[in-house]
Amino acid sequence: MSFSEFYQRSINEPEQFWAEQARRIDWQTPFTQTLDHSNPPFARWFCEGRTNLCHNAIDRWLEKQPEALALIAVSSETEEERTFTFRQLHDEVNAVASMLRSLGVQRGDRVLVYMPMIAEAHITLLACARIGAIHSVVFGGFASHSVAARIDDAKPVLIVSADAGARGGKIIPYKKLLDDAISQAQHQPRHVLLVDRGLAKMARVSGRDVDFASLRHQHIGARVPVAWLESNETSCILYTSGTTGKPKGVQRDVGGYAVALATSMDTIFGGKAGSVFFCASDIGWVVGHSYIVYAPLLAGMATIVYEGLPTWPDCGVWWTIVEKYQVSRMFSAPTAIRVLKKFPTAEIRKHDLSSLEVLYLAGEPLDEPTASWVSNTLDVPVIDNYWQTESGWPIMAIARGLDDRPTRLGSPGVPMYGYNVQLLNEVTGEPCGVNEKGMLVVEGPLPPGCIQTIWGDDGRFVKTYWSLFSRPVYATFDWGIRDADGYHFILGRTDDVINVAGHRLGTREIEESISSHPGVAEVAVVGVKDALKGQVAVAFVIPKESDSLEDRDVAHSQEKAIMALVDSQIGNFGRPAHVWFVSQLPKTRSGKMLRRTIQAICEGRDPGDLTTIDDPASLDQIRQAMEE
């Protein structure tokens, strides 16, 4: 079957199509209804079927390949490497599942995971899946304020963390950040389970904090039966940035997620059991959830958990891993590759990369120079793909397992099966023609594996994603165009979310952080193009006192203070690249901030129609501030 036929069947006969794909995983109880779309836009997949992500990732491989590699944990920071076969991983996951139960974690309870990229983090997520607990991973780069907001939203009974992580030789004190977060949160977890790596001192709260290693010793050899979950029960909550400043908890199911990932590993990524998949992301992001934690194991592949930078201790660290473990498929973000471009290609080419068949890049638009450099340096195909936290797996790609069409530089490919993608005119809602810019939307129902709803807020789910046009379609909030051959090109965000090195950040979140500085009267944050990171945040601040406008030393001092504040409240990846001080900001006469206009000026583009602006002189201030 050609990819075109495969795709059309998924759109025209979705129930039959996905019922066939569901055979890729084990079901303890068969589903009675493939799709329930009786309450749109909500979609329920594989109704009344019972399955389990942990069983499909580990247990079902115990008979076929118990001694095959399953998990490879590498830290270039501590120079530690650990490997687990499927049998060994099964033992460890059972022990941690027993530990969780001993701490009172039950089916449906939330477990918040705030950990570095170590084996225990991955094992904890699989243990949650085993017993039917809902895991919610918070990216290790988030500061206490952001962690506290997620604690209050998810209300976990247990938090699993560590003393510290490391990045580029710098210690990140997870426990200290977590203690600060818990002190700020209204919700209080019953227990905090802590992995002590010996990297940083940590204070322990009596009666609440539990040592991971000591408890594990008590549960070695335990066997915990799989909790067979109805397909539409919740597997995880993963927070993504929103324009309101309050992060959205993307809620995902069990059966649909497993089927979507298993199908994607075969058809999109061409993964084969017994081979090794290296996704150089973080489990705190959706790419890590899907293609570090679950998808490779669902396909019987080994997966790599990597702690460190692509350049630490040197620019060959990734390629040493590829060579040593015979990695066949690799997944990263363009930003990481742009960093590597600064180093001599000889440092990469000195490694034996003959096992590597393809490199996948996602998280931000892939530019032509980066794609060409990778392809020439590694001598492998480079496959872009486009998706979101909400989708859980690629919306667009080239399905290497089915499709032999060539890649097209600058394009993430064509719509994937299950996604009825349209480009709509933002004003009329009418479909766009070839090479006409429009908003990229998906007709409902969304395919398996996608967002079920926003955790605890169905109304926000409908209002945010399904209410932009006169008819209900899922809005991606990305601009796109389609060429005559069906290739799509992503042109950027339509909302106030920016993409910094593959990390989505709400400009409102950064603005709220900056606004909390006592010297700030008003602020506007926009994302601007950056050669290395794709986008960076920049801030324009109206200070309460005029000395920041008149004295460069004062302005520099205030800029440093504001950056430090954002670091502490959001994390250093949210830090603005620049903070400029102005006496007024461009707004419409109704008071709406003209962020797109500010962004255009920052990027040297035509700001467009300015008929609604209240005071054109405010634009001159933006220009002058940038020139100083």
UniProtKB/Swiss-Prot annotation:
One of its GO terms (molecular function) is ATP binding. InterPro entries: ACAS_N, AMP-bd_C, AMP-bd_C_sf, AMP-binding_CS, AMP-dep_synth/lig_dom, ANL_N_sf, Propion_PrpE. Its EC number is 6.2.1.17. The keyword Nucleotide-binding applies. It catalyses: propanoate + ATP + CoA = propanoyl-CoA + AMP + diphosphate. Disulfide bonds: none annotated. Pathway: Organic acid metabolism; propanoate degradation. One of its GO terms (biological process) is propionate catabolic process, 2-methylcitrate cycle. Keywords: ATP-binding, Ligase, Nucleotide-binding. Gene3D superfamilies: 3.30.300.30, N-terminal domain of ligase-like. It comes from the Bacteria. It is an enzyme of class 6 (ligase). The keyword ATP-binding applies. Signal peptide: none annotated. It holds the Pfam family ACAS_N. Catalyzes the synthesis of propionyl-CoA from propionate and CoA. Also converts acetate to acetyl-CoA but with a lower specific activity. Belongs to the ATP-dependent AMP-binding enzyme family. This is Propionate--CoA ligase. The gene is prpE.
